[in-house]
């Protein structure tokens, strides 16, 4: 088996280097805990010696960072590599930059000082004209920003809600949701922009906004009740197969969008007869069309029934 893996590794331009492959192989083949500890200790000593050296290529630096992550996965301290992780986030190569952001999110605890060092990098990457850099930075917002960093990044996140590219707008909505979870007052001045996202031309962007609005409505439902007619209209369009078939699952149109809409309607219609009356017809149609005998259909029916039990009764 090991020879087969060696042949595969040597025959491919794998994303991992030979040294890392040999490390994983050696640990996997170790006969005792003592032997495993010896291998890990030797690896740590090697990394501590080579990481401070200058002149590493981005590719080599990424591999060394990955090896330090592997050391941490095995229960050892890999903090000696954290500064190099921050450097990797500044790489001009998108793949290495993404690796740096991911490594930082996995290793730097919320109170770590190196997170503050990444704020400026995140801001610069969000302003990039490269879509992938922007989405990578927005992922960094979701994973690395803490409550005290929110004011520094929220302005750039809000601007990206109007980006030309759909994936960037979707990521921006997700990042804004995370900022709201960290600081509920941070989005208070941007409700109008959040409302406009519901009407985004890309259903995936609109779907990302539903989770944010659901949390906002749970905190103050009165601010969002006026969205009920729009949400009902969107739900009706979905069940009538007006969305692209790309959103279908087992011939059920956009089932996860349907379920998120139903959860939101349940919150907005609770104890409100006027709002609830706007929902009765579409809820009945949702249950009728979803009852197809497959699991995802049952999930939609369940959410619809739950919504019915939450809103004002139809008397």
What spans do the regions from the language model cover?
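Extended alpha-solenoid helical-repeat scaffolds
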Residues: 2-14, 18-81, 86-89, 93-315
């Amino acid at each position: 088996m090991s020879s087969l893996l060696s042949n595969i590794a040597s025959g491919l331009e794998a994303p991992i280097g030979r040294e890392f492959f040999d490390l994983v192989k050696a640990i996997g083949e170790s006969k005792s805990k003592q032997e495993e500890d010896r291998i890990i200790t030797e690896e740590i000593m090697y990394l501590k010696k080579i990481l401070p050296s200058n002149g590493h290529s981005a590719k080599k630096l990424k591999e060394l960072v990955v090896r330090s992550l592997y050391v941490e996965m095995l229960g050892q301290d890999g903090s000696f590599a954290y500064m190099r992780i921050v450097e990797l986030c500044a790489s001009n190569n998108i793949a290495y930059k993404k690796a740096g952001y991911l490594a930082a999110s996995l290793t730097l605890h919320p109170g770590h000082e190196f997170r503050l060092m990444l704020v400026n990098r995140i801001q610069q990457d969000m302003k990039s004209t490269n879509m992938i850099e922007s989405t990578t930075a927005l992922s960094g917002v979701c994973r690395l920003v803490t409550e005290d960093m929110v004011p520094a990044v929220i302005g750039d996140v809000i601007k990206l809600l109007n980006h030309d590219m759909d994936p960037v707008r979707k990521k921006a909505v997700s990042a804004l949701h995370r900022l709201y979870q960290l600081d509920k007052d941070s989005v208070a001045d941007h409700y109008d922009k959040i409302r406009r996202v519901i009407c985004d031309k890309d259903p995936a962007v609109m779907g990302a906004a539903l989770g944010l609005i659901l949390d906002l409505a749970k905190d103050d439902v009165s601010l969002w009740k006026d969205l009920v007619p729009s949400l009902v209209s969107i739900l009706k369009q979905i069940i009538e197969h007006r969305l692209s078939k790309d959103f279908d699952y087992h011939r059920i149109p956009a089932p996860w969008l349907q379920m998120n809409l139903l959860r939101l309607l349940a919150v907005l219609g609770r104890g409100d007869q006027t709002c609830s009356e706007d929902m009765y017809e579409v809820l009945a149609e949702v249950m009728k069309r979803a009852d197809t005998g497959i699991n995802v259909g049952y999930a939609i029916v369940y959410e619809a029934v739950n919504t019915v039990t939450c809103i004002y009764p139809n008397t």
